[in-house]
Amino acid sequence: MTEYVLLLVGTVLVNNFVLVKFLGLCPFMGVSKKLETAIGMGLATTFVLTLASVCAYLVESYILRPLGIEYLRTMSFILVIAVVVQFTEMVVHKTSPTLYRLLGIFLPLITTNCAVLGVALLNINENHNFIESIIYGFGAAVGFSLVLILFASMRERIAAADVPVPFKGASIAMITAGLMSLAFMGFTGLVK
């Protein structure tokens, strides 16, 4: 049980996919201008990442490895992710049309989010079992959502602040992301 908690804490805080592994930077910078959009994207990504991790583990364990076709891993994981994203898009469209409009093009772009494919591939490379795959996918998703929501909150405050002209826009966003990354480095010794 302790190793599961450590895996969860490690993926959320210590080995955060955005700030440490630099995966998922496109939605991190693109969707983080408004807090409500960031929360919606975080929830959608959490659902997709967790479900894609489980599906990727099952595809690897019950199809690719038994048939000896591991060389099709990346292509099959992309297909699995696309199916999960389409399912998520249908669910969001039916349950929250407002959120669906707010997310716009970013919802289908979860398919190309490198964090989703990265988590699926790292699950296999680190030889996680079924439970560990669920925890790893969920932890990565929670870490992504946490960073996305924190960054969106900061960007909303920065938008209202008096920022010097040369630092407006992407410049101050990158500086803020760097400072967030430094803050998360404080968790480095938490899990070995």
Curated annotation (Swiss-Prot):
Report whether Electron transport shows up as a keyword of the record.
yes
Which terms are listed as keywords in the entry? Cell inner membrane, Cell membrane, Electron transport, Membrane, Translocase, Transmembrane, Transmembrane helix, Transport
Organism of origin: Vibrio parahaemolyticus serotype O3:K6 (strain RIMD 2210633)
| Subunit structure and binding partners | The complex is composed of six subunits: RnfA, RnfB, RnfC, RnfD, RnfE and RnfG.
**Which coarse location class applies to the principal site listed for this UniProt protein?**
membrane
Instruction: List the HAMAP family.
Output: RsxA_RnfA
Q: Which Pfam families match?
A: Rnf-Nqr
Q: What compartments host this protein? A: Cell inner membrane
Q: Name it.
A: Ion-translocating oxidoreductase complex subunit A
The membrane-spanning stretches of this chain are 5-25, 39-59, 67-87, 102-122, 134-154, 171-191
Q: Which family does it belong to?
A: Belongs to the NqrDE/RnfAE family.
Gene Ontology cellular component list: plasma membrane
Query: Tell me, what is an example of a GO biological process annotation in this record?
Result: electron transport chain
| EC number(s) given by UniProt | 7.-.-.-
Q: Which InterPro entries match?
A: Ion_transpt_RnfA/RsxA, NqrDE/RnfAE, NqrDE/RnfAE_oxidrdctase
What role does this protein play? Part of a membrane-bound complex that couples electron transfer with translocation of ions across the membrane.
